[in-house]
Amino acid sequence: MEKQKLIDMEGVVIESLPNATFRVYLDNGCIVLTHISGKIRRNYIRILPGDRVKVELSPYDLTKGRITYRLRAKSSNN
């Protein structure tokens, strides 16, 4: 049986919910409910509202996803 391909998207965390769950506003305008992946949980990476993240979505349910990476904030040079 072939494994289904996941949909990778980027977005911004807009709300932090209980149990390591977040509401993310994707670049295409959708809002999805996400949880964090095991590697992020294991390495104690903090995710806060306003952070830019990469999200994996299942093709079966596009309203739920998994945060796989927290993108670095752009540094401003003075």
From Swiss-Prot:
Q: Which UniProt keywords apply?
A: Chloroplast, Initiation factor, Plastid, Protein biosynthesis, RNA-binding, rRNA-binding
A GO CC annotation given for this chain:
chloroplast
Q: Where is the S1-like domain?
A: 1-72
Q: Could you tell me which InterPro entries the record lists for this protein?
A: NA-bd_OB-fold, RNA-binding_domain_S1_IF1, S1_domain, TIF_IF1
Q: Which PROSITE patterns match?
A: S1_IF1_TYPE (PS50832)
According to its UniProt record, where is this protein mainly located?
Answer: plastid
Q: Fetch the SUPFAM superfamilies from UniProt.
A: Nucleic acid-binding proteins
Which one Pfam family would you cite for this protein? eIF-1a
Which residue ranges traverse the bilayer? none
Please tell me whether the keyword RNA-binding is annotated for this protein.
yes
Where's it found, cell-wise?
Answer: Plastid, Chloroplast
GO function terms (MF aspect): ribosome binding; rRNA binding; translation initiation factor activity
Q: Which CDD domains match?
A: S1_IF1
Q: Which family, according to UniProt?
A: Belongs to the IF-1 family.
Purpose: One of the essential components for the initiation of protein synthesis. Stabilizes the binding of IF-2 and IF-3 on the 30S subunit to which N-formylmethionyl-tRNA(fMet) subsequently binds. Helps modulate mRNA selection, yielding the 30S pre-initiation complex (PIC). Upon addition of the 50S ribosomal subunit IF-1, IF-2 and IF-3 are released leaving the mature 70S translation initiation complex.
Q: How does it assemble?
A: Component of the 30S ribosomal translation pre-initiation complex which assembles on the 30S ribosome in the order IF-2 and IF-3, IF-1 and N-formylmethionyl-tRNA(fMet); mRNA recruitment can occur at any time during PIC assembly.
Q: What is this protein called?
A: Translation initiation factor IF-1, chloroplastic
Gene that encodes the chain: infA
